[in-house]
C-alpha cells in the first residue's frame, strides 16, 4: 500500500485513541491490500480507492472497537469481513464469528483469515435464520438490516446479559421506536470516523 494509505491509517487510529502494535498495523495494511486486490475481480465493495478504503472500511470498523468487550463476538451480515476482521486484528483476545450468505464474500473472509494468520476468526456462510450457534456475548451489525429485524433474527443467538451493537445513521430514531418492548437502548454513541463526514451512531442494546 502507498505511503498515503499508511499515513491515513496511522493518523486515523491515533485520532480514535487506539494504540496499535506493529503486528496489528501490518495486518490492517495487508487486509487493505487484499481487499483492494479482490475487489477488482469480485466487486466486494463500491469503494474502489485504497485511501477511501482506509477511511470508510478500516477506520469506520475501528471506530466501534472501544465498545467491544467480547469475548465471543458475532458479526452478522459481515460482507467482506467488516467490522469483524478489523476488530479481530485490533484485539486478538476476541473470538470473532463472521456470518454472511454471500459465497464470494465469505471466500474473501476465509482468504483473509488464511493470509493474515488470524486464529481468532471463523467465517461462516449461512443465512442468519439458519445459523444455530448460540451464546454470543455481543452481536454487531454494520449494514445488515433494520434495527428491529436485526434484533429479532439474532435474539436466539445472544447470551444472557449480552449486547447488540448496531452501527447506524444518526437518523435512527424511527428504527429505535420500532424495537420490541423487551429490548432497551443502553448507549447511543456518535461515531466520529477520521476523514469521513458521514453522520453515524453506535447503538448498544440489551434485553430489558
Swiss-Prot record:
PANTHER family xref list: S-ADENOSYL-L-METHIONINE-DEPENDENT METHYLTRANSFERASES SUPERFAMILY PROTEIN
MF annotations from Gene Ontology: rRNA (guanine-N7-)-methyltransferase activity
EC number: 2.1.1.170
Name of the protein in question: Ribosomal RNA small subunit methyltransferase G
Gene name of the record: rsmG
Keyword Transcription regulation attached: no
Source organism per UniProt: Chromohalobacter salexigens (strain ATCC BAA-138 / DSM 3043 / CIP 106854 / NCIMB 13768 / 1H11)
Database matches in Gene3D superfamilies: Vaccinia Virus protein VP39 (3.40.50.150)
CDD domains listed in its UniProt record: AdoMet_MTases
Annotated function: Specifically methylates the N7 position of guanine in position 527 of 16S rRNA.
HAMAP family: 16SrRNA_methyltr_G (MF_00074)
Annotated residues for binding of S-adenosyl-L-methionine: 77, 82, 128-129, 142
NCBIfam families: rsmG_gidB
Family: Belongs to the methyltransferase superfamily. RNA methyltransferase RsmG family.
Subcellular localization: Cytoplasm
Chemical reaction(s) catalysed: guanosine(527) in 16S rRNA + S-adenosyl-L-methionine = N(7)-methylguanosine(527) in 16S rRNA + S-adenosyl-L-homocysteine
Keyword DNA damage: no
Coiled coil: none
Amino acid at each position: 500500500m502507498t505511503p498515503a494509505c499508511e499515513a491515513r491509517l496511522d493518523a486515523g487510529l491515533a485520532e480514535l485513541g487506539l494504540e496499535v502494535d506493529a503486528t496489528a498495523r501490518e495486518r490492517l495494511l495487508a487486509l487493505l491490500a487484499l481487499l483492494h486486490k479482490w475487489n477488482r475481480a469480485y466487486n466486494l465493495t463500491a469503494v474502489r480507492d485504497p485511501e477511501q478504503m482506509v477511511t470508510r472500511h478500516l477506520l469506520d470498523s475501528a471506530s466501534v472497537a472501544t465498545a467491544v468487550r467480547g469475548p465471543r463476538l458475532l458479526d452478522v451480515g459481515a460482507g467482506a469481513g467488516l467490522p469483524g476482521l478489523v476488530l479481530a486484528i485490533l484485539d486478538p483476545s476476541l473470538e470473532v464469528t463472521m456470518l454472511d450468505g454471500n459465497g464470494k464474500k465469505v471466500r474473501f473472509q476465509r482468504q483473509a483469515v488464511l493470509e493474515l494468520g488470524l486464529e481468532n476468526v471463523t467465517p461462516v456462510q449461512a443465512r442468519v435464520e439458519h445459523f444455530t450457534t448460540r451464546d454470543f456475548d455481543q452481536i454487531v451489525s454494520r449494514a445488515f438490516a433494520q434495527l428491529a429485524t436485526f434484533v429479532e433474527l439474532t435474539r436466539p443467538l445472544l447470551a444472557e446479559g449480552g449486547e447488540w451493537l448496531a452501527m447506524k445513521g444518526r437518523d435512527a430514531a424511527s428504527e429505535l421506536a420500532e424495537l420490541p418492548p423487551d429490548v432497551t437502548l443502553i448507549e447511543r454513541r456518535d461515531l466520529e470516523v477520521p476523514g469521513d463526514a458521514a453522520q453515524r451512531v453506535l447503538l448498544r442494546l440489551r434485553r430489558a
